[in-house]
């Protein structure tokens, strides 16, 4: 286009109008009429606001991609028999491919081991409670004790399991099983296995998901489980919770995204296997306090699982929490009041100003853990985005 400040007679080149060339030249005055009118103040404000929104959306999308591309490290902590390993099993069921037939067959030995350990504990409990098991069960009791001592569970004779099934109907055995707790130690899942003992003794028995979830195998090392939830990658590290293994925890404190701390609600009337005298609930609260008050974790989210809700609800019908906490003055069999009291006791170990995300869980309930972990994912995603300024 010719400049409007000269008087040359050179023809004005054709200009593009919606992609078509105009064949006739235009005067300077007609050319300036094609410019857009100035933007009104209100329109300009809306434009700037939309531009800011678009910029924020772009930033959020970049941060979400960053989260998707990274791996969130979850450190799973808690004392022995809190249910930590059950949470790991649930991740395998929910977010990996579950258990193969070969893995289920391999898990069978742990089911048998649990049954023998439960039967052995109850037999010993009968002695503690001065309950007599009839002599007709002498042979099966001897077999149970021998297997327990040798730890040979792989090729367990099914007749032994059938013998346990018969023994479980005996009145002394039943009374001992119902009066464990502070009297002697018993697996928290004992009722599950005793109620279905006939199925476990079948020749073609293959463990179900529930059987595997209820099976207790004490962690003695560190295990890592990698999985994804809606595109977000997680690495869950389960560290053994017994006293002798806690010195290993510090080796996994670096680059932690969050800590999942698990406490069993039903351990208030039990003592540690390690020393036979320390109350397990008191020990769990102490260890929780040691972790949450560590300077390493001042900026790390702490997610608390108050686990074994189902067993807790059953236990307080017989034994109230005042056996551990004399300052509890509510009804001994009131689930809600007992739960609120325990929650306050546990959280009182937090001497920092940081929030603790608390969930009441049943780790053997796949639906419950699925919902809880979705909430955990949302918490961690939101926290990561807030750290990115979103």
Swiss-Prot record:
Residues 1-42 are annotated as: Disordered. One of its GO terms (molecular function) is G protein-coupled receptor binding. Residues 1-12, 22-42 have a biased composition (Low complexity). GO terms for biological process: adenylate cyclase-modulating G protein-coupled receptor signaling pathway; gamma-aminobutyric acid signaling pathway. Residues 303-310 are annotated as: G4 motif. Residues 234-243 are annotated as: G3 motif. Gene3D superfamilies: GI Alpha 1, domain 2-like (1.10.400.10), P-loop containing nucleotide triphosphate hydrolases (3.40.50.300). It comes from the Eukaryota. Pfam families: G-alpha (PF00503). The keyword Nucleotide-binding applies. Residues 211-219 are annotated as: G2 motif. One of its GO terms (cellular component) is heterotrimeric G-protein complex. Mg(2+) binds at residue 85. Keywords: GTP-binding, Magnesium, Metal-binding, Nucleotide-binding, Transducer. Residues 73-86 are annotated as: G1 motif. Guanine nucleotide-binding proteins (G proteins) are involved as modulators or transducers in various transmembrane signaling systems. G proteins are composed of 3 units; alpha, beta and gamma. The alpha chain contains the guanine nucleotide binding site. Belongs to the G-alpha family. This is Guanine nucleotide-binding protein alpha-7 subunit.
